[in-house]
């Protein structure tokens, strides 16, 4: 993976890694202090919990389709807001969701952008 990916490219890689269930591809994209708010339950999970759920196949994504995205950059921080449609399973139960998301990226000392926070909400307009 290039060290010079934009936040938008890291976002694309994040969705691709989720769909592939590829933890080794996902881990370099995530900040060490990464947190995610689950779209279905509203629960907060850290990097270790997300990667474990994917590695153990508790969480699987059949597809994550990006519908739209807009971004703002503020120095060493970038915020992307977008819409996705996704399908997968959690603990064996199938799910589908149309979501709006906010992803916050930070640029580290090594100049690489990493996803620091992800928040998903149901898209009522979908």
Protein language model features and the residues they cover:
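A beta-strand edge to alpha-helix "cap/lid" segment located at domain peripheries
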Residues: 1-27, 35-126
């Amino acid at each position: 993976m290039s060290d010079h990916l934009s936040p938008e490219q890291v976002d694309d890689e994040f969705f691709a890694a989720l769909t592939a269930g590829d933890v080794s591809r996902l881990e370099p994209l995530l900040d060490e202090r990464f947190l995610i708010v689950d779209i279905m339950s509203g629960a907060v999970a850290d990097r270790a919990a997300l990667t474990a759920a994917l590695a153990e196949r508790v969480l699987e994504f059949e597809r994550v389709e990006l519908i739209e995205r807009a971004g703002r950059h503020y120095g060493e921080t970038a915020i992307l807001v977008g819409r996705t449609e996704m399908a997968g399973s959690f603990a064996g139960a199938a799910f589908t969701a149309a979501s709006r998301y906010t992803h916050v990226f930070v640029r580290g000392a090594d100049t690489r952008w990493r996803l620091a926070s992800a928040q998903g909400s149901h898209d009522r307009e979908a």
